[in-house]
């Protein structure tokens, strides 16, 4: 019986599952949007959102706790310098999971995971001068 056993196994043993979620969390913080399967996305939310909440207050202890969970020095820096201050006034719900159809090979449900309130990359089109203006 699996009474009171929360979380998903994701067809992995505990060490593999922990490493997978650590890597996915670091990738999410690095790129701010990733594509993965729906069960992994839902499980990722349980790992990544508490880290962002932790990063709202920057001190040495919280950085060490975040490093123990992420094991990526660069992403811990980004978490506390960029993501923590960005979500200072938001009381949770830092991620959005958008379903995006099924994977062609095995028909697994896929999803985009993105951080809300992320700065949009606006590439301005190069100014095209028309021939009439000349």
Swiss-Prot record:
Molecular functions (GO terms): structural constituent of ribosome
GO CC, alphabetical: cytosolic large ribosomal subunit
Pfam families: Ribosomal_L17
Keywords from the named record: Ribonucleoprotein, Ribosomal protein
Gene3D superfamilies in the record: Ribosomal protein L17 (3.90.1030.10)
GO BP field: translation
Keyword Lipid biosynthesis: no
Similarity-based family: Belongs to the bacterial ribosomal protein bL17 family.
Subunit architecture: Part of the 50S ribosomal subunit. Contacts protein L32.
Protein's recorded name: Large ribosomal subunit protein bL17
């Amino acid at each position: 019986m699996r009474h009171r056993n929360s979380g998903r196994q994701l067809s992995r043993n505990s060490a593999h599952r922990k490493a997978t979620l650590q890597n996915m969390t670091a990738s999410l913080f690095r790129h701010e949007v990733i594509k993965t399967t729906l069960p992994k996305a839902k499980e990722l939310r349980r790992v990544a959102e508490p880290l962002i909440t932790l990063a709202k207050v920057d001190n040495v202890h919280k950085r060490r706790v975040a490093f123990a969970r992420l094991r990526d020095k660069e992403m811990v820096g980004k978490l506390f310098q960029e993501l923590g201050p960005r979500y200072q006034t938001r009381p949770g719900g830092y991620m959005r999971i958008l379903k995006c159809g099924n994977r062609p090979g095995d028909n697994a449900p896929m999803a985009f995971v993105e951080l809300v309130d992320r700065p949009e990359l606006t590439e301005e089109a190069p100014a095209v001068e028309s021939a009439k203006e000349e």
